[in-house]
Amino acid sequence: MQHRLFLGLDLLPHQKQQLATWQAQALAHPKAAVFSGNYHLTLAFFGERDDSELTDIVQHCQELVKPALHSHFGLLGYWSESETVYLAPSQPNRQLNDFANRLRALFELSDRHPFSPHISLIRGAKKPATLVAEPANFTLQWQALTLFRSRSTNAGVRYQALARWPLPTPARLTP
């Protein structure tokens, strides 16, 4: 069986709700928002993989040393090429970048774009969103590395968590 897989950082349910509420109040755009249950930050994209590759990914992730990670989100952005409105960290995060690059190297993944941490808010956007309220100001303490499967449904694409590996909690959180 084939699976469309990626590794990412999932938001907790209350964080997804906070982000969805902010998005509904702060952004004006004619295109519908991404399903809030899909909010996540992609670290490594595998594409289509079979069951044996899925098993290998799970095994490697179980053995992987994982860092404590947090991100402060405050930058609204737009990529015209992929027609995506997104929220990005307001400051570079070396630990996050290093971890994503380590995952890509471990799984020998090549991507034509460098790692650019973000949470997609609107897809199929022909133009940027207009900010009509306060800018975003979210600090997220990431709880787990998550292996997701992307599935097409009648309601649109949905991301299903197949496995989670806890991340350590830092001694102190700094934005």
How should each PLM-predicted stretch be described?
Residues 1-175:
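Histidine-dependent nucleotide/RNA phosphoesterase domain, centered on the 2H-phosphoesterase fold
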